[in-house]
């Protein structure tokens, strides 16, 4: 989606979402579930629960999360899957090149992501492109998940940003709408090509 703010505007900060914008999740390898393949729906549903959301917010730790598992879901299987998830994440090559281009143009780059505490350290070890960011704020550090306005407010405060100097890119429209409530302009990511054209039209490239 696009907002109705004037087309030509000077932005100095570009804020990126991580998942489904810069990186993608690959399916779990078939050998991970093995004989427990039938439990996959239960496992996937657990990742959508309030308990897992609280884990991503840093409200509960991994041990507390494990204690909330459905009885039919073995702890060992859950732990194996948790370790595998960050290894299944792969960057979108053209988006990483775009990051590098924006950095070379002098923009300050920020990352705002809903992510589990165990995942981010692995991604930081795997992906050097994360070093391009001038600041990173995770949901577990903010104790809030997008689209909660709290996480956007904290980003602005923590890095001393002025909302009208920022342009936000996220794959979920609800997150863009939340950011706009604080005066942060943005666009919903659908593809590299669409984003590139949008940035060109906004005079960001």
Where are the language model's segments positioned?
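A metal-dependent, Asp-based hydrolase signature
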Residues: 52-81
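Short, acidic loop-to-helix structural element flanking the phosphoryl-transfer center
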Residues: 63, 82-110, 149
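Active-site neighborhood of HAD-like aspartate-dependent phosphohydrolases
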Residues: 2-49, 53, 57, 181-182
